[in-house]
Amino acid sequence: MTNSNLRTENHFDYVKISIASPQRIMDWGQRTLPNGQVVGEVTKPETINYRTLKPEMDGLFCEKIFGPSKDWECHCGKYKRVRHRGIVCERCGVEVTESRVRRHRMGYIKLAAPVSHVWYLKGIPSYVAILLDIPLRDVEQIVYFNCYVVLDPGDHKELKYKQLLTEDEWLEIEDEIYAEDSTIENEPFVGIGAEALKQLLEDLDLNQVAEELREEITNSKGQKRAKLIKRIRVIDNFIATNAKPEWMVLDAIPVIPPDLRPMVQLDGGRFATSDLNDLYRRVINRNNRLARLQEILAPEIIVRNEKRMLQEAVDALIDNGRRGRTVVGANNRALKSLSDIIEGKQGRFRQNLLGKRVDYSGRSVIVVGPKLKMHQCGLPKEMAIELFQPFVIHRLIRQNIVNNIKAAKKLIQKADDEVMQVLQEVIEGHPILLNRAPTLHRLGIQAFEPKLVGGRAIQLHPLVCPAFNADFDGDQMAVHVPLALEAQTEARMLMLASNNILSPATGEPIVTPSQDMVLGSYYLTALQPNYQKPEFGDNKTTFASLEDVIFAFEDKRLSLHEWIWVRFNGEVEDEDEMRSPQKTQLLEDSSRLEIWNLRRDRFDSDNNLISRFILTTVGRVVMNYTIIDSVSKT
């Protein structure tokens, strides 16, 4: 590959998909060999020879067209080894090169009659129907040989351009034209099938039609205007891309490289093959039969039937089941066409190009991790040892625990305490990325500090769930390990979950408690009517600090919803604040005791607060203590 080729491959502005012209389709498959021979046309439906198990010449796996099936070896075996590179064998005509060319070299099938492309005919919307301004039902009648279409009305007064005629109607008109007393000089001309469709599309002058439509749009309203706009959009797209409407009718169809539709020998001697080979074989068989019928000047009705069958075979190859009966193989299973391979979730784009499997990644079910901090996630040890294996191996060798990679891998398989200790050191400060599909906004992938956990599930902090739109009913998440230092820094600085509190779309908090957290908070702070409020000063239910309450609760001396008196010198929001206390007592030491509904405040002579006891539940103490403890640590 030259430097200029390298440049064009690696530096481009955009990729454009447009309709291919018949010549371009031929150019894809046609090649001139070093000896000047032009190859590329697939003319035989055979795949491989059942005796020699070698590809048949001019067939769907032909080595002359697609390249050798073995590296640096021609079909007949005359030339072997790399020293014969570029030579074309005089005996079999195969170029001596690498077998991997069979992954990108294409062929083509030259059709004996034009066929319509099913995507443009039966797609939604039907571009053929829109361009010709003919209902889709009528276009189908023409393409599948049910009706004639008038291509040139001639001198006939009753015929109009693009008018549909049944077989009987056309026979009557023919009798009228060829009658002895006929006055028609310019005979009308009709067509049927994809050839007629191609003629109609060739007759379109896009620029002129576009001008006429623009004039018509200014004077029209409602549904008619919408229809005209839809038509002009299609025409403008054709003009802008320099595509011709008649290219929607195929004169040749490309044959994709054989290694993308392989034929594999199974253990029992049988062969497994791609469905595409069966679909291509149907097309070639029908195409060859049609060519033979045309050569021997077979009756028109037989030729027409063969053309219709060729159209149906090409339809099945491009999009099986889009129109007519679905072509099935063994076990009554529908054959996978080119469209089936490309489209959908399991198609080439979404499965293989957009959704590639990447190294240093894993996937598992998520469960709630209530003891985690917001920037942490629980990573199963089994997954961590696999993801961080190169780092662990490096550290094991550096610490002289093992001498080589093989010994390190053996030690890792045992997963003993020594390995786990090294793994713990490796993941310390090494952020990982968690992604939940579908990633609809940038918070769908965030960074976390991993914490080693048992089991096989990833533990996630419940507060980050709204950002991922995740819940714990079986959702799965992917783990990715940033390798480069720049990637790790970026993950820590920009993507860490604790740095993404606000939604980038609205600016509102996206870290909000929901579901379990809300229910838990409610249950923790709920007041149960069946619990009696204790008298102030009761030793069993009066505590000197929040810590004492927590200890008593953990010791199972208190239940969660039990009323208690607890000393608390912090600020208290009380509904009674605007009113005066229920009762005020002057004590012997000149201090003053204010008795409120849910608290007792004691002040000295200078009105300074000495102590405050509040009446609350154990659950509310747990809630407050947890929040105060968390805030004080940050």
From Swiss-Prot:
Binding-site positions, Zn(2+): C74, C76, C89, C92
Record-level Gene Ontology MF annotations: DNA binding; DNA-directed RNA polymerase activity; magnesium ion binding; zinc ion binding
UniProt EC number: 2.7.7.6
SUPFAM superfamilies: beta and beta-prime subunits of DNA dependent RNA-polymerase
InterPro entries: DNA-dir_RpoC1_gamma, DNA-dir_RpoC_beta_prime, RNA_pol_asu, RNA_pol_N, RNA_pol_Rpb1_1, RNA_pol_Rpb1_3, RNA_pol_Rpb1_3_sf, RNA_pol_Rpb1_clamp_domain
Entry keyword annotation includes Nucleotidyltransferase: yes
GO terms under biological process: DNA-templated transcription
Cofactor mode of binding and number, as noted: Binds 1 Mg(2+) ion per subunit.
A Pfam family of this chain: RNA_pol_Rpb1_1
Keyword Iron-sulfur included in the entry's annotation: no
Keyword set, alphabetical order: DNA-directed RNA polymerase, Magnesium, Metal-binding, Nucleotidyltransferase, Transcription, Transferase, Zinc
Residue positions binding Mg(2+): D471, D473, D475
One GO location term (cellular component): DNA-directed RNA polymerase complex
Swiss-Prot/TrEMBL catalytic activity: RNA(n) + a ribonucleoside 5'-triphosphate = RNA(n+1) + diphosphate
Cofactor(s) the protein needs: Mg(2+); Zn(2+)
Record-stated family: Belongs to the RNA polymerase beta' chain family. RpoC1 subfamily.
Subunit structure: In cyanobacteria the RNAP catalytic core is composed of 2 alpha, 1 beta, 1 beta', 1 gamma and 1 omega subunit. When a sigma factor is associated with the core the holoenzyme is formed, which can initiate transcription.
Annotated function: DNA-dependent RNA polymerase catalyzes the transcription of DNA into RNA using the four ribonucleoside triphosphates as substrates.
UniProt protein name: DNA-directed RNA polymerase subunit gamma
Gene: rpoC1
